[in-house]
Amino acid sequence: MNLVLLGNGFDLSLGLPTSYIDFLDTMDFILASESDSYKTVADIWCSKQLRKRNKNIANAYDKYKAIYESIPFPEGVIAAIKSTLEKNSWYRYLTGSFNKDVGWIDFEQEIQSVMDSFSFVLNSCESQPSINISGHFQKDFYIVHSFNFLLECEKQEKSNTFEKIYSVRREFTIERPLGSGHRVIDKEKIIAYLYDELRSFTSLLQKYLDVFIDTPFAEAVKQKMIGSHKLFGYTERVITLNYTHSFECLYPSIDVIHLHGEVGKKIILGIPSDVCDNDEFPNTDFIMFKKYFQRLVYGTDKEYLYTLLEELQNSPGKISLAVMGHSLDVSDRDIIVELFNVSDSITILYHCQSALETYVRNLVRIFGKRGLDELRATKDLKFCPLSKAQLFTTEQEMETFFDVLEQN
C-alpha cells in the first residue's frame, strides 16, 4: 500500500497563501478597513499595501487573479468576520504580540505559552479575589493582561517594596463559601472562556480557508488553470493535517483522511500532548486545548484510528510512506511515530537544504539519534529532493521511483 502524509507545505507549493501569517495579515486588513462591502477576494488582495507586506498573497493574487475576481463572497461573510475580529481576545493577543513570518507550529507554541502563563498565575492566586503581579514574571502578566480579565491596579507599599494588585472582573469570580460574600477567582470559568474564544478564532480560520482558499482553488482546477499534477497519482491513501481540500481537487479518486478536521466541518487547533498526559492522575485543567482531546471530541480521527491503522497493521503487503510539506515537528509526534512504525519504507520529500536540515533535527527530537539510525536501517528511511521526484501514475512507475531511491 502506498501512503502519503501531507502538511501545509503542499498547499504552499500550489501557490496558496495558507500559512498563519497569510491568514493573520488578511484579518488585519479586513479589521483596519472602514468598509465591509468587499465583493470578492480580489477586492481585498489587490491592495498594494497588503501585497507589499505579504509575498505569498502577492504571488497568489498574480497567479489566480482571474478566479479571485470572478467568485463573489457569500452574503455577509466579511461583515461577520469583522464582527468576530473586533471581539475576539485570541486575535487581539496574537496580532499585538508579534509581527513576523511564522507558521502553524509557532501558533501552537503561542497557545502553549498562554496556557503556561495562565496555569502559573491562576494556581498561585487560588482562593484569592485578585492577582498580585509582583510575584510573577513580566511575560506571564503581559499574557494574562492581554485577555481582559483584569481591572484596576492598586499599588500598595509593603516592606519597602511595591506590590501591584489587580482585581479580576466580577464575572470571572465566584462566591466561596456560598453566602459568605467572599469572592475568589473562578479558574474553571476563565479557562472555559479562553477555550470558547479559541473556538471562535478557529471559526475565523474556517471562513478564511473556505472563501479565500478552497472555493477559488476548486474553480481554478475546474477551469484547468492548474497544470497536470501527477506526483501522487498512484497513491492509495492520504493522511493530511491540512484543513483544505486542495488535494481532493487534484486527485478526486484518492481516499483522503483529514486528521485535524476540514473546511466545512470541525477543525482541530491546539497544542500537542506531553509526558504529563500519561501520569496516573494527570492535570486536566487545560485538556480541551490538547489536539488529542479535540480529535476525540470532534471525531476527526475515527477513520484513522479504527479503519486505516488496523488495515495497515494487518496488511500482508509492503507499506510505503511518502511525506510532503509536513515539518515533522514534535507537536505531531504521536501521528508520526504511529505511521513510521507501520511503514516498511519511508521517503521524505524536501524542497531545499534548510528544509532537509529541519526534518532531520525534528526526527532526532522525536526518535533520538539511535532511533533515527534504526529507522534508516530497518524502515528504509530516505530523503529525496522534490526536483528528483518522478511524476508516477502507475504502480510500476512508483516502484521504479523507490528503486531509484534505494540506489542513492
Which role fits each region the language model picked out?
Residues 19, 270-274, 352:
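Intrinsic-disorder/low-complexity, polar/charged segments
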Residues 1-14, 20-26, 30, 35-52, ...:
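SIR2/sirtuin-family catalytic core signature
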Residues 225-232, 307-315:
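Short boundary motifs at domain starts and secondary-structure transition points
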Residues 296-307, 326-330:
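A general structural motif
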Residues 40-301:
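Extended, H/D-rich, highly charged conserved domains that either
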